[in-house]
Amino acid sequence: MIANDDEWKGTRARIAYFEDLLAQMRVAARPELFPSMASGYRAEIEKMQWEVLEYLTRHVSQPAPAEVA
């Protein structure tokens, strides 16, 4: 879970990096292998995007939710 603006910025950079990797794979990967190669990156991008939205829609005065172990 993103706890501060530094983590938010880092997560945004990581999303952009993964999106760039997917864009390269779309061109370079063999068509039959692409879905299995892309699925993990897609899942990670979706997870990070959810975390970004959770962070941005929580008012700055609200504490970050406790993480479940």
Regions found by a protein language model. Name each.
Residues A28, E32-P35, P65:
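Flexible domain-boundary/linker segments
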